[in-house]
């Protein structure tokens, strides 16, 4: 079951679980729930399994900086910028949580579903920043764990974004390169 942070059923204490986010650990919990951003808690049975951080936007978002620019109104595009399993969560729960999140936003009239995803193993495979074509080939090879997850769950690579994240983590992993995967309903 998906429980959005703007729901009465969402316990605000759950936001403390954001500290387990391995993708964007430095983003404050308050920033994740402001404007058109929300945190989704995915539960199975009585246990919290997964958290998904999203932004609903009027268009595709191609950088982390733009994730935090508030849209004037909610749009037709859901951007998933963090998805992570919680400690002791079941294996494979991320795929189920993502499907539930798509269903949740579809019911609200959202039509487009994208991620803004890191490529954490990019620097391990290239000595210098790769070209867009090289990134696309690398993603298609599924050697990157994030690519393997999204492509394995039916997404397609939509865009390669250079200078998409200036954080030390992204610079160290991928020269700040991030990608958009697209999920179709």
What are these regions (language model features)?
Residues 1-91, 95-185:
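Extended, composition-driven regions rather than compact fold-specific motifs
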């Amino acid at each position: 079951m998906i429980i959005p942070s703007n729901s009465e059923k969402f316990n605000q204490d759950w936001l403390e679980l954001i500290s387990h986010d391995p993708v964007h650990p430095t983003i404050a919990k308050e920033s994740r729930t402001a404007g058109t951003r929300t945190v989704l808690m995915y539960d199975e049975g009585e246990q919290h399994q997964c958290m998904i951080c999203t932004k609903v936007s009027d268009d595709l978002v191609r950088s982390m900086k733009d994730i935090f620019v508030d849209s004037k109104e909610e749009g037709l595009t859901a951007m998933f910028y963090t998805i992570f399993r919680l400690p002791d969560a079941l294996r494979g729960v991320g795929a189920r949580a993502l499907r539930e999140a798509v269903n949740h936003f579809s019911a609200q009239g959202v039509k487009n579903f994208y991620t803004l995803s890191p490529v954490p193993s990019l620097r391990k495979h290239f000595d210098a920043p790769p070209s867009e074509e090289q990134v696309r080939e690398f993603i298609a090879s599924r050697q990157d764990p994030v690519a393997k997850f999204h492509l394995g769950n039916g997404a397609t690579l939509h865009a390669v974004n250079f200078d998409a994240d200036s954080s030390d983590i992204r610079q160290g992993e991928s020269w700040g390169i991030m990608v958009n995967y697209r999920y179709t309903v």
